[in-house]
Amino acid sequence: DCTLTITIPDNVSLNSIQADLNMGDMDVNNIHASSGDFSVDMGSLKIADSSIKNLTADNNMGDIKLTNCGSDVLNLSVDMGSLKISGMDIDKYSANLSVDLGDIKVNDSTYSHSYTNNAGSGKSINADVNMGDIKINR
């Protein structure tokens, strides 16, 4: 079992952070940054209790899970796997969500193939899942 742990002091806010992983699981916790770009080829990507204003995340084969993340702009992509977001009020975002093969569940409502919402708040989420589901809960 190989593990790499990078610790950033609590009072530090990063300008940007980028991490790429070919195979394995990436866990990002308690990060504060203006922008973040995370990519996993095969494995899971979990981001929790973080504030990343402009977040880009991509997973080729595996899940992306965001929990209690404060972001103004999210660009998320999953080729084969699911996208799960909890602790986010989707009604405050202009949203463009799409799945090719799977469902989209926003709070208690289920949509097939696409979901759009224009909140006019300046916050946005763009998410595309090729094969899998998108689930967003408050």
Feature locations, PLM:
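Right-handed parallel beta-helix
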Residues: 1-53, 65, 116-138
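Short, surface-exposed interaction patches in beta-rich subdomains
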Residues: 47-50, 54-138
